[in-house]
């Protein structure tokens, strides 16, 4: 036969467990780091990265070197539609509307892969998100370095010869 529990014993037992769970809940909340990213002045945060627009015109290689002066910095790689919209909002209205913007996309095969299959992010991020402004392999004067096209409000990708000088967006950790 089970011992008979009084109302008083049950109440104290419940209070004890509520107290233990409350204390554990507070401790676990303190251990979780903040997901907010603080970026330097002139830069804006998206997820865990900072982004900055540089309006100084540079070649693709020189632009990436300039971005590397920031912590883990490089030209921007755009991995989702949400990130594309964010970068578009960062750039729109801040550069000459006829100028494209360098991004970290390039074709190391120099156009040898059919259907634009040689394009990749320079850090080897998987190219799952595609947003070409037309087929990059079909243009007569195609380049091997990627850009955001001004005609698409900086949402779609284009290609240029890598020595063309354009403004650019850097993506970096803070």
Curated annotation (Swiss-Prot):
Keyword Secreted listed: yes
Induction text: Appears in pancreatic juice after induction of pancreatic inflammation.
One GO cellular component term: extracellular space
Domain C-type lectin: 46-171
Signal peptide: 1-25
One record GO biological process: negative regulation of keratinocyte differentiation
Post-translational modifications: Proteolytic processing by trypsin removes an inhibitory N-terminal propeptide and is essential for peptidoglycan binding and antibacterial activity.
Residues given in the record as Zn(2+) binding sites: 106, 120
UniProt-recorded name of the protein: Regenerating islet-derived protein 3-alpha
């Amino acid at each position: 036969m089970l011992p008979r529990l009084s109302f008083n014993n049950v109440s104290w037992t419940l209070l004890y467990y509520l107290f233990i769970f409350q204390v554990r809940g507070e401790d676990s909340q303190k251990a979780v780091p903040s997901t907010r990213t603080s970026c330097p002045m002139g830069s804006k945060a998206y997820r865990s990265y900072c982004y900055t627009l540089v309006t100084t015109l540079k070649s693709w290689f020189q632009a990436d070197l300039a971005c590397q002066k920031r912590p883990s910095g490089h030209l921007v790689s755009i991995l989702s539609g949400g990130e594309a919209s964010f970068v578009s909002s960062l750039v729109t209205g801040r550069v000459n509307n006829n100028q494209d913007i360098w991004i970290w996309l390039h074709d190391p095969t120099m156009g040898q892969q059919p259907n634009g299959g040689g394009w990749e992010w320079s850090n080897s991020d998987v190219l799952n998100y595609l947003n070409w402004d037309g087929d990059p392999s079909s243009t007569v004067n195609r380049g091997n370095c990627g850009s955001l096209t001004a005609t698409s409000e900086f949402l779609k990708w284009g290609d240029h010869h890598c020595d063309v000088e354009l403004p650019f967006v850097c993506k970096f950790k803070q």
